[in-house]
């Protein structure tokens, strides 16, 4: 039995996916993907499976464990882990090209991070300045 492990990251969220032969079950932190809320996060997670096609989707089981970040960062990290797992599972360069054409961040990480707040104005954000008064 073949088992492949992959990871995906987005902002501070980290997802680890395990893919094995199965019947098309996808679980995120032990929950079936069908009950993941909000809907936009569910559709984001399912994108690589829809692009890969029914025959690939129905031949594998995918378990994803996600931690850190917000719901959308977690969804995008899970999407990346699933996409990488499917490419490795099939060994198909045309699938990799399809993912890259659709959205490059499915396979390649996004390096952007939040800017740290600076001293003296920590609640207002990293670049906020003190208000200047002329009289």
From Swiss-Prot:
Q: A Pfam family matched by this chain, by name?
A: Ribosomal_S9
**Record's compositionally biased regions (Basic residues):** 119-135
The source's domain of life comes to Archaea
Q: Which InterPro entries match?
A: Ribosomal_Su5_D2-typ_SF (IPR020568), Ribosomal_uS9 (IPR000754), Ribosomal_uS9_archaeal (IPR019958), Ribosomal_uS9_CS (IPR020574), Ribsml_uS5_D2-typ_fold_subgr (IPR014721)
- Ranges of compositional bias, category Basic and acidic residues: 107-118
Q: Keywords of this protein's UniProt record, alphabetized?
A: Ribonucleoprotein, Ribosomal protein
Annotated region described as Disordered, given as residue ranges: 107-135
Give any single GO term for biological process.
maturation of SSU-rRNA from tricistronic rRNA transcript (SSU-rRNA, 5.8S rRNA, LSU-rRNA)
The reply to whether Glycosyltransferase figures as a keyword in the UniProt entry is no
CC per GO annotation: cytosolic small ribosomal subunit
Key word Amino-acid biosynthesis present: no
Q: Name one GO molecular function term.
A: RNA binding
PANTHER family the UniProt entry points to: RIBOSOMAL PROTEIN S16, RIBOSOMAL PROTEIN S9
Record note on quaternary structure = Part of the 30S ribosomal subunit.
The entry's family comment says: Belongs to the universal ribosomal protein uS9 family.
Recorded hits in HAMAP family, A to Z, give: Ribosomal_uS9_A (MF_00532_A)
| The protein, known as | Small ribosomal subunit protein uS9
